[in-house]
A protein has these predicted regions:
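C-terminal hydrophobic helical "lid"/dimerization subdomain
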Residues: 2-5, 13, 168, 299-349
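Glycine-rich phosphate-binding loop and adjacent beta-alpha segment
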Residues: 121-122, 251-317, 346-349
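Glycine-rich beta-strand-centered segment in the early N-terminal region that forms part
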Residues: 28-45, 59-111, 148-150
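N-terminal Rossmann NAD(P)H-binding glycine-rich loop of SDR-like oxidoreductase domains
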Residues: 187, 195
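Adenosine-nucleotide cofactor-binding segment
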Residues: 180-183, 199-252
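Conserved "cap/hinge" positions at secondary-structure junctions
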Residues: 93, 109-110, 185, 209, ...
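Hydrophobic/small residue at the entry helix of a nucleotide-binding pocket
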Residues: 165, 189-190, 213, 251
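NAD(P)H dinucleotide-binding glycine-rich loop of Rossmann-like/cofactor-binding domains
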Residues: 71-75, 108-185
C-alpha cells in the first residue's frame, strides 16, 4: 500500500443519466479512520439503489436534490456509488483489529457507523458515503464481515444488497415453513434472492415474473410461477397466501391485498412499477393485515446471510460481469431487465 496513492473509480458528478458517470484513474486512495478498514475491491454488484440515487428517484418532489439520497438528504458530489461489495482488507485504522488484514470480506450496505462515529440515522454505502465502484473503499470494521467461501469475488458481490434486503423482508414478515408466499418482481436481484431465502426457511413460494422468465424463477426454487400482468385473482382466488413480498407496487397493487389471507403479512422494499398505489383501508383493517416497510436492516440479518452463504444454503445467481469502465453499459443492461439474477462489476476485468 505504501507505493499506491491513486486508484480507479467512477464518479457520479450530478443527478442525471449515464452521462453523469465519469471514469477516473487519478482518485486518491482513502485512508481508514480510527475504527475503519480499507478494502481492495474485488467486485461490486449493480442494483436499483445506485440507479435510483443517480436519477434522484428517492426525492418526493420532482427530483429535488435536497432529498434525493437514500436517507432523504441532499447527495454530496462527486460521489462514488456501489452498494454491493466483496474484497480484501488491506489496511486498518488504529482502533480496528489488525487481524482483519488479508481477510476476504462482504460489506453490510446499511451502515450504522461512518467516519469513525455512530450514526443517528443509518446510511447506505454509495449514497451517503463512497461505495465500491472503485479499486478501494473504506468502511467501519463492524460492517466488514469476513467470509469463508470458495465462491469468486464476483459471485459473492451478488449477495450483499439484494440478499440482505430479501432476508430483511422475510424477517419482518416472520416467514416460517408453514407459510405460502407470493413474490412480485421475482426474477430481479431481490426477488430471486427472496425465492432462495424463503425456500431455505421451508416456505412455499409463488413467483410473479414475465412470461420469458417463468422457467428461471422455477429454477431458482419457486414452487409455482405466474405471468406478470395476469389477474392474480383468476390465478389464485382470494385469501390464497400468507405473505406478500412486494418489489413492484404499481396500479395492480390492490390485488395483492385481496389474495392475502386474514392476518396476512405484507412486506415492501421496492416500487419499480410506481410508488403511488390505491389502498382501500377496509381491506387492511377488516382482514387484520400487517404491513412492513423494509429499508434499514434489522440487527442480525447480515450475519445470518453470511452464515447461509458459507454453508452453501443459497447460491449466487450471477447473470453477467462487466469491467469498471463499462458501468454505464452495465446499468443500461440492468434497466433492460432481460436477465435473471445479478450483474456485477468485476475489478479484475
Amino acid at each position: 500500500m505504501a507505493d499506491l496513492q491513486t486508484m480507479r473509480a467512477i464518479y457520479l458528478m450530478a443527478h442525471g443519466g449515464p452521462e453523469a458517470l465519469v471514469y477516473r484513474n487519478d482518485i486518491p486512495i482513502p485512508a481508514p479512520r480510527r475504527s475503519e478498514v480499507l478494502i481492495k475491491v474485488g467486485a461490486a454488484g449493480i442494483n436499483n439503489t445506485d440507479i435510483n440515487t443517480r436519477v434522484g428517484w428517492y426525492s418526493k418532489g420532482e427530483g429535488d436534490a435536497a432529498d434525493a439520497s437514500w436517507g432523504g438528504q441532499a447527495l454530496s458530489f462527486p460521489r462514488i456509488q456501489g452498494a454491493d461489495i466483496c474484497g480484501e482488507v488491506v489496511d486498518v485504522g488504529e482502533q480496528a483489529d489488525p487481524g482483519l488484514i488479508g481477510k476476504r470480506v462482504l460489506v453490510e450496505p446499511c451502515l450504522r457507523e461512518a467516519n469513525g462515529e455512530p450514526l443517528v440515522s443509518p446510511w447506505y454505502i454509495g449514497s451517503e458515503c463512497d461505495g465500491g465502484f472503485a479499486d478501494y473503499v473504506t468502511v467501519a470494521a463492524r460492517h466488514a464481515y469476513p467470509i469463508d467461501s470458495s465462491l469468486s469475488d464476483a459471485e459473492l458481490a451478488s449477495f450483499p444488497c439484494s440478499y440482505s434486503t430479501a432476508e430483511n423482508m422475510l424477517t419482518r414478515a416472520q416467514v416460517t415453513e408453514n407459510d405460502t408466499l407470493l413474490i412480485t418482481g421475482a426474477s430481479g436481484g431481490v426477488g430471486s434472492a427472496a425465492i432462495q431465502l424463503a425456500k431455505a426457511r421451508g416456505a412455499s413460494v409463488i413467483a410473479v415474473a414475465s412470461g420469458a422468465k417463468q422457467q428461471s424463477v422455477l429454477d431458482a426454487g419457486a414452487n409455482r410461477a405466474l405471468i406478470r400482468g395476469n389477474s392474480l385473482h383468476d390465478e389464485l382466488g382470494d385469501n390464497a397466501v400468507d405473505v406478500v413480498i412486494d418489489l413492484v407496487g404499481g396500479e395492480d397493487w390492490p390485488e395483492l391485498l385481496n389474495i392475502l389471507r386474514p392476518f396476512g403479512r405484507y412486506a415492501v422494499s421496492g416500487a419499480i412499477a410506481g410508488p403511488i398505489v390505491e389502498l382501500d383501508l377496509r381491506t387492511l383493517y377488516l382482514k387484520d393485515q400487517r404491513f412492513a416497510g423494509c429499508t434499514v436492516l434489522d440487527e442480525g440479518v447480515f450475519s445470518r446471510l453470511v452464515g447461509l452463504i458459507e454453508r452453501g444454503d443459497i447460491k449466487p445467481l450471477l447473470a453477467r460481469s462487466f469491467p469498471l469502465e463499462s458501468l454505464s453499459e452495465a446499468q443500461a443492461f440492468f434497466l433492460d431487465k432481460q436477465f435473471t439474477g445479478k450483474l456485477v462489476i468485476d475489478m479484475g476485468l
